[in-house]
Every structure is written in structure tokens, then in C-alpha cells.
């Protein structure tokens, strides 16, 4: 195989998820010491709808992050998976009591997207009451 062709194959592998853009890579990035990197990882994982079985547990863990933005974005991402994230319901119910209103709000919305029986989050839940 020629040198140019090897580079094309390598680039295609990277684009196809075998390299830095793989699900495993982004799950590992949820442990980054940099909060912006963790948020970027949440957003990247949110786009991988066909891999919920691997991603949802990682996002549930991210709901415990020290950073408010990571917790909020994790709740939003879980909601985007809909019923595939039903294992996240207990963790999201816990997040309804988060100290930050934006996290509580995101958790309530996520719960309503995962299971409509949870209904729309009440303003009371968003206030943590």
C-alpha cells in the first residue's frame, strides 16, 4: 500500500470512531481534570444515540461531577436519549435536589423526556422544594 493510501486509511479510521472520536475516548474524557473537556465529552456522547447502553451509565456518573455545568449538561444529555435512559431515573430524581437550580431544572426536563409519566418539571422542583 502506498504512503498516501495509508494516510487515507488512517484518517478514515479516525473519522469512523476508531481513534480519538470513539465513544470510549469520550467516556474517558469525563474524568478529565478540565471541566471544559468534561463538558465537551458530554456533548460528544449525547450525539451517539445508537450507543446508549455504554453511554448512559457514564452520564449517570457525570451527574455527580463537582462542576455545575457538567452536571446540568449530563442531565440534558440523558434526557436526549429518551426511554433508552430509563436506568437514569433514580439518579435524575436525586438531581432534582441538587444545590443548583439549573441542574434541578435540567433533571426535571430529562425525567419528562425519559418517561412522560413524570410530566413537566414543576417550578417547585426547580427551586428544590
Placement of each model-derived feature along the sequence:
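Structural detector for internal amphipathic alpha-helices that build alpha-solenoid repeat scaffolds
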Residues: 19, 36-51, 69-84, 104-117
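Amphipathic alpha-helical scaffolding segments comprising HEAT/armadillo-like alpha-solenoid repeats
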Residues: 19-28, 50-63, 83-95, 117-128
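Sec-dependent bacterial lipoprotein signal peptides
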Residues: 1-16
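Generic N-terminal initiation segments characterized by hydrophobic and/or small/turn-forming residues
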Residues: 7-11, 27, 42, 56, ...
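Positively charged, low-complexity intrinsically disordered regions
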Residues: 4-7, 73, 77, 87, ...
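Short inter-helical turns and helix N-cap capping residues of alpha-solenoid HEAT/ARM repeat scaffolds
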Residues: 33-34, 66-67, 99-100
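Compositionally biased regions
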Residues: 5, 30-36, 63, 81, ...
Amino acid at each position: 500500500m502506498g504512503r498516501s493510501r495509508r494516510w487515507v486509511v488512517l484518517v478514515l479510521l479516525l473519522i469512523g470512531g476508531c481513534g480519538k472520536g470513539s465513544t470510549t475516548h469520550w467516556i474517558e474524557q469525563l474524568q478529565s481534570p478540565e471541566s471544559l473537556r468534561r463538558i465537551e465529552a458530554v456533548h460528544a456522547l449525547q450525539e451517539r444515540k445508537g450507543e446508549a447502553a455504554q453511554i448512559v451509565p457514564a452520564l449517570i456518573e457525570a451527574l455527580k461531577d463537582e462542576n455545575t455545568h457538567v452536571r446540568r449538561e449530563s442531565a440534558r444529555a440523558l434526557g436526549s436519549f429518551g426511554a433508552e435512559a430509563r436506568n437514569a431515573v433514580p439518579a435524575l430524581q436525586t438531581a432534582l435536589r441538587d444545590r443548583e437550580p439549573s441542574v434541578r431544572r435540567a433533571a426535571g426536563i430529562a425525567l419528562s423526556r425519559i418517561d412522560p409519566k413524570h410530566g413537566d418539571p414543576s417550578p417547585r422542583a426547580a427551586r428544590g422544594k
